[in-house]
């Protein structure tokens, strides 16, 4: 657990550099720090993805990597998942 509040290292509008994987080139549409996970929950548009283009990820501040992706065909579905992930 953290000794203080989580400070986000990513902002809306950021284009992820990634590592050549699915997150590379994705645009952050929304982000919110998650104190429990010491990371951010992010909603992105990843048009080059071989999956559906809207995705929620957990973004690790320390490594700068995304993981636990949930993919959706529409922004609305992605946003609903973003809100759910913030509550869990």
Q: Where on the chain are the PLM-derived regions?
A:
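Residue-level detector of high-confidence beta-strand sites
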Residues: 31, 69-70
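Short aromatic-glycine-(Arg/Gly/Cys) micro-motifs in beta-strand/loop hairpins
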Residues: 40-68, 84-87
């Amino acid at each position: 657990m953290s000794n203080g509040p989580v400070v986000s290292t990513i902002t809306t509008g950021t284009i992820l550099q990634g590592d050549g994987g699915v997150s590379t080139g994705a645009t952050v549409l929304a982000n919110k720090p998650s104190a429990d996970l010491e990371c951010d929950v992010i909603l992105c548009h990843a048009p080059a993805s071989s999956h559906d283009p809207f995705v929620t990820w957990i973004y690790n501040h320390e490594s700068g990597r995304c993981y636990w992706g949930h993919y959706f065909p529409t922004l609305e579905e992605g946003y609903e998942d973003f809100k759910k992930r913030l509550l869990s």
